[in-house]
Amino acid sequence: MINRKFSRRAIAKQLGSIAGGAAVFGPGFAGILARTPAQTEGPFYPPPPHAETDVDLTLLDGHSERAAGDTILVRGRVTDLEGHPLANARVDIWQANHWGRYAHPGDNNPAPLDPNFQGIGIALTDADGRYGFRTIRPAPYPLSAMGDSGMRPRHIHFKVAHETAGEVTTQMYFEGDPLIADDVVMRGTPAELRHLLITSAVEDAATGLPLHRFDIALG
């Protein structure tokens, strides 16, 4: 059964309000881009069936209360390595909640679950390769629940796929997070490419929310 939240009509409507206008992103450009570095998917992609996968992870159907935490916007463009936009690319995101716990039965973190947080979102890019999500800034979390030591920095998982340009699984990080430098996952990415996975925030003119730009280059 097709999730009604993942229809092209619903995605197009929500992308218009969450991703903003084309002027935010600008036109495509010609040139050779660095391929977005791949990182591990990790063990916590939310298992199906997914009750909701729309682009607003902060508000569930039938709920009057939004997810706990600081609401942010995440927007970007999916392109090939020459900067040409890729329409109809599928963008999956998933992440820990405000307390650092995933909506996954295998997450043994004792932090609380958030009954108002969706945990996963899926979008299709528009004709200009744009996507957009409304979510919350995830918390860092200890690796002890997975039998390891240390902490993971704040991050959002991405899986992006296009029928001709291929796919990448990666993670988006937040500028200024002191945990990035010693992160076991980030250490697996070449130092000269790590900046491609770290985003800074600007204020979104329409909503006043922190806006993180995260572009993906496939090829």
Question: Which ranges hold each PLM region?
Answer:
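Beta-strand-dominated extracellular/periplasmic modules and repeats
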Residues: 29-219
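N-terminal secretory signal peptides and thylakoid transit peptides that target proteins
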Residues: 1-22
